[in-house]
């Protein structure tokens, strides 16, 4: 665990601190450029699209260079994207920066997950991965608070500069650990081909993978629903950032209990309730008209997201093949990111009519997703420490 703390958890905390400051601001930044709510929601689509590319690239790069070196490259891309957003006053270059942020973050995510999985036993897998996810959540709680302070002092763009500095600090912390110097043996080329991995894992990908894609859509939508609705009812930028912090604060309290429940009773005990709670929070938002109501909905979203901490990573680790594991994890992340692309895209498309319509559709999708997870998550066998695959 000491090795994970220095090479994984500390750099992750620093990087996610900056990301937490930026995530609530993508849509708000586009709105400040005098674009519509539909275009603002599309910023989350661009971010998710960048993540899809980063997931595919991150799995292959991690297999070739090892997870630590791949993480350094991902962090460099993430910092570069934050700088681009900080200096871009118009839409197109700003969205390019958002895409680069998504690309670098996903590449880093795949690399970090691979390292944790390689260092822990299966019986402790959920707790190790939820601790990683919990590190993100703690940083995502503090990040919006610091972001709100930076915005109040220096304006919206300064938050992106702050994020770039925290990611650079993560690079320094990772390079200070001894693990980055170790380069693994080069794997066989056949292990690196995404098509081979997809073909051999198709029974899992077309069932549980579909449920993961839907979960990604519901979770990603929560990033845009709060700022868009808050803007529509006249809330300030700093108030939105503070509400995000409240949601993240609830979120971060649940990661370790969620991991313990997964390791003892199975993955479905967190995945299904988590998705239902996110659906409930999304469905509640259109019925709110002030900060108190938005905060209540945000707390529901935070509880749901926190209770599902690390579950998608854990499911991917459970079903990943021995050969081509890094590439499979990248493919698994692509499914999550495809969902992350679909959720905000759905809201963006429906926002042309009314925001509430998009929220109701996403909330209904969350209920369907919970049923899919209940159906396809493999039965848990604690005596085997791993779930059995289902036909």
State the predicted function of each range.
Residues 76-89, 277-289:
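C-terminal ends and interior cores of transmembrane alpha-helices
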Residues 1-2, 179-210, 391:
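Juxtamembrane intracellular "pre-TM" segments in multi-pass secondary transporters
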Residues 99-136, 315:
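Cytoplasmic helix-loop-helix junction between adjacent transmembrane helices
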Residues 164-185, 370-378:
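C-terminal membrane-cytosol helix-exit motif in multi-pass small-molecule transporters
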Residues 1-48, 206-211, 215-229, 233:
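Helix-loop boundary and gating motifs at the non-cytosolic
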Residues 19, 100-112, 300-312:
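Core transmembrane helices of Major Facilitator Superfamily
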Residues 54-66, 254-266, 351:
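Helix-to-loop junctions at the C-terminal end of transmembrane segments
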């Amino acid at each position: 665990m000491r090795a994970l703390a220095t090479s994984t958890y500390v750099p992750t905390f620093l990087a996610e601190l900056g990301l937490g400051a930026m995530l609530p601001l993508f849509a708000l930044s586009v709105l400040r450029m005098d674009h519509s709510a539909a275009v603002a929601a599309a910023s989350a689509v661009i971010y998710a699209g960048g993540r899809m590319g980063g997931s595919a690239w991150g799995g292959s790069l991690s297999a070739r260079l090892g997870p630590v070196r791949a993480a350094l490259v991902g962090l460099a891309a993430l910092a570069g994207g934050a700088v681009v957003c900080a200096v871009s006053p118009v839409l197109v270059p700003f969205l390019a920066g958002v895409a680069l942020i998504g690309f670098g973050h996903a590449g880093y995510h795949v690399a970090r997950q691979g390292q944790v999985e390689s260092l822990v036993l299966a019986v402790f897998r959920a707790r190790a991965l939820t601790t990683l996810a919990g590190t993100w959540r703690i940083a995502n709680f503090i990040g919006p608070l610091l972001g709100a302070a930076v915005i109040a002092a220096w304006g919206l763009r300064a938050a992106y500069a702050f994020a770039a500095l925290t990611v650079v600090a993560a690079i320094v912390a990772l390079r200070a650990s001894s693990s980055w110097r170790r380069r693994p043996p080069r794997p066989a080329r056949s292990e690196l081909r995404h098509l081979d991995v997809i073909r051999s894992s198709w029974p899992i990908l077309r069932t549980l993978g579909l449920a993961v894609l839907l979960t990604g859509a519901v979770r990603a939508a929560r990033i845009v629903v709060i700022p868009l609705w808050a803007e529509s009812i006249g809330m300030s930028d700093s108030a939105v950032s503070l509400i995000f912090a409240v949601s993240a604060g609830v979120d971060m309290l649940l990661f370790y209990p969620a991991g313990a429940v997964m390791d003892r009773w199975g993955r479905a005990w967190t995945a299904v309730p988590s998705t239902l709670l996110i659906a409930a929070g999304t469905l509640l938002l259109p019925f709110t008209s002030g900060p108190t109501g938005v905060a209540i909905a945000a707390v529901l979203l935070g509880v749901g997201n926190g209770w599902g901490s690390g579950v998608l990573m854990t499911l991917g680790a459970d079903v990943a093949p021995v050969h081509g594991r890094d590439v499979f994890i990248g493919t698994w992340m692509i499914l999550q990111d495809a969902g992350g692309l679909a959720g905000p895209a759905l809201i963006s498309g429906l926002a042309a009519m009314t925001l509430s319509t998009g929220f109701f559709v996403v909330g209904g999708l969350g209920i369907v997703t919970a049923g899919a997870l209940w159906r396809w998550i493999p039965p848990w066998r604690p005596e085997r420490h791993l779930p059995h695959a289902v036909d």
